[in-house]
Amino acid sequence: MISAIVLAAGASSRYGTSPPKQQELLPHVLAALRRAASLDDVLVVLGAHDVEVDGRTVRCPDWERGPGASLRCGLEALPASAEAALVVLADGPELDPRAVDRVIESWRREGGDVVAAAYGGVRLHPVLLARSAWPFVPDEGARGLEARLVDCDDLTPPGDVDVRR
C-alpha cells in the first residue's frame, strides 16, 4: 500500500493570503493525486488553519516546528500496511499525476529509501519515502534526506506559490 501525504499545515503567511492558500490550492493537488493510478490512500496534514478537505486529515499540533514535524505527524497516521509514503505540498497546484505514478513505479522497480521527481535536474515533489526512511525524517522534512532522482523533464513541475516569479 502506498499513501500520499499532502503537507498543508503551514500558516500561509509569506504573502499575507486570506483565506489561507491551502483552501484554494488543495482541491487541485487532491484532484491530481486521485488521477494517479498508483496510490491507495491520501492523507492531508493540517495545522495552522482549519481547512475544509474532501478526504482524510490529521491535525499536527507541532506544525510550527516545520515541515519535518508535519511530515512525521502524517507518517504516524498512516496504516501499518503502508509500505511507502508519497509526499507532496499543498502549494504545488500544478502537480502532474504522471509524476506521481512515475516516482512510484520507479521505486517499485528499483527500490530505494527515498525517491524524488527531478525537473531539469532539480529535485522537487513528489518525493517517495519507503517505510525504512520514516524514522530518519529531519526537521527540514524530506528535503533533508538523500534521494534517488527520477527524470520528469517532460512534465510540468508542480509549482510553488511561495516562489515569486
Predicted feature locations:
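Active-site regions of enzymes building and remodeling cell-envelope glycoconjugates
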Residues: D54-D62, A147-V150
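Conserved alpha/beta core of the MobA/IspD/sugar-nucleotide pyrophosphorylase nucleotidyltransferase superfamily
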Residues: W134-R165
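Short, low-complexity, intrinsically disordered N-terminal peptides in bacterial proteins
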Residues: M1-S3, R109, R164-R165
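A short, conserved beta-strand element in the Rossmann-like catalytic core
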Residues: R14, E52, P93-E94
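Conserved beta-loop-beta/alpha segment of the NTase-like Rossmann-fold superfamily
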Residues: E64-R131, P135-F136
